[in-house]
């Protein structure tokens, strides 16, 4: 399982820190007990070029579950950084999928896959992002139209509400979305943590 850790570090800073990156000890999402550090694993992340990054693992002593602690710029199961994926999704919803792929220097098939996953999950994401607005004490904007556009609008409203409450430390829109979905914005078999509640 993966947990998204909201960090202000950029990809380059995180990579340069290596094993010295200061990852906090988190509570187990399953049983809420404190976890202990349980090593690292290497994973590639592409932002223009692919580079190896170390990801911290933590293990719960109570339920024995282990979790990868992904920095907020890293999406679960995706090679590309969330800061690359998110703007491409926005461009695709606007009908510019091929242009988005060309601008990013990525294969069209990669960008098309992101769109397919986002479209498949759009209703669930729209509901979750609207629920986040309510939880943050913000009004839910009028949501109508295609599910993908509704999901983007609800995400924007939730992000603005979070920034009003907590300030710029919330990070940019797509890091916020990645954290809110537990890294599962585009996963195939795993839903965001809030989807079952």
Residue ranges, per PLM feature:
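Feature targets compositionally biased, intrinsically disordered low-complexity regions
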Residues: 9, 17, 38, 47, ...
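Short, conserved DNA-binding cores of transcription-related domains
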Residues: 1-74
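Long C-terminal interaction/binding lobes of large macromolecular proteins
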Residues: 1-10, 20, 124-197
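Short, positively charged, Gly/Tyr-enriched micro-motifs
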Residues: 59-144
């Amino acid at each position: 399982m993966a947990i998204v850790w909201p960090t202000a570090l950029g990809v380059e800073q995180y990579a340069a820190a290596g094993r010295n990156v200061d990852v906090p000890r988190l509570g187990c999402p399953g049983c809420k007990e404190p976890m202990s550090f349980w090593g690292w694993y290497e994973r590639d992340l592409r932002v223009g070029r692919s580079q190896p990054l170390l990801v911290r693992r933590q293990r719960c002593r109570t339920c024995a579950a282990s979790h990868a602690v992904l920095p907020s710029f890293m999406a679960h199961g995706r090679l590309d950084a969330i800061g690359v994926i998110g703007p491409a999704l926005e461009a695709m919803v606007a009908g510019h999928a091929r242009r988005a792929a060309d601008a990013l220097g990525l294969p069209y098939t990669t960008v098309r896959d992101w769109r397919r996953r986002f479209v498949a999950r759009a209703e669930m994401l729209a509901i979750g992002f609207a629920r986040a607005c309510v939880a943050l004490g913000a009004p839910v904007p009028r949501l109508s139209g295609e599910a993908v556009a509704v999901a983007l609008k609800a995400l924007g409203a939730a992000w603005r509400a979070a920034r009003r409450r907590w300030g710029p430390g919330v990070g940019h829109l797509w890091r916020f979305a990645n954290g809110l979905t537990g890294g599962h914005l585009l996963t195939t078999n795993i839903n965001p943590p809030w989807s079952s509640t």
